[in-house]
Amino acid sequence: MRVLNFVLTTTVVLLTSSEGIASSPQVRHIKPNVAIDHLSIRSLRATENPGSDESRLNEKDTGFDPDGSSSKEDEDIGEPTFWEKVRFRYWKTMGKTPGDLRKEYFEGMDEAVIKNNPNYKLVQQYEVYYDEKSSE
């Protein structure tokens, strides 16, 4: 009797859920008509100032600080996401320092390769988080 109830319940669920599936003519109407070309996407800055020359350095912001750090790199770090903040809190609780993360992620790598690594930004964000929480 239980097997029969299971089979009937499964059949009812499958039949009712099959009506929610889009048929092929419906799918054609849902698809966008515009093909996205990733190479043709322009940045907002270029579209706002079409006549500006982006290759020139702005005299006010050269991206270099006298103490040797780059302000451009600090600006590009951005805000960590919620999950990155959770990860940072876990690392801080476990006693990991930014030096430990650099060693874990980038040991034996060239500096040019490190800056192109997706984890480079994460480690920089953790350094900022670590400094803020250590000073409290």
Curated annotation (Swiss-Prot):
Compartment(s): Secreted; Host cytoplasm; Host nucleus
Domain of life of the native organism: Eukaryota
GO cellular component: extracellular region; host cell cytoplasm; host cell nucleus
Induction pattern: Expression is up-regulated at the earlier infection stages.
Main location: secreted
Sequence motif RxLR-dEER, location on chain: 42-56
UniProt entry keywords in alphabetical sequence: Host cytoplasm, Host nucleus, Secreted, Signal, Virulence
Domain remark from Swiss-Prot or TrEMBL: The RxLR-dEER motif acts to carry the protein into the host cell cytoplasm through binding to cell surface phosphatidylinositol-3-phosphate.
Described purpose of this protein according to its UniProt entry: Effector that acts as a broad suppressor of cell death to interrupt plant immunity. Inhibits cell death induced by cell death-inducing proteins, including the PAMP elicitor INF1 from P.infestans.
Recorded family membership: Belongs to the RxLR effector family.
UniProt name for this protein: Secreted RxLR effector protein 10
Species this protein is from: Plasmopara viticola
Lineage summary: Eukaryota, Sar, Stramenopiles, Oomycota, Peronosporales
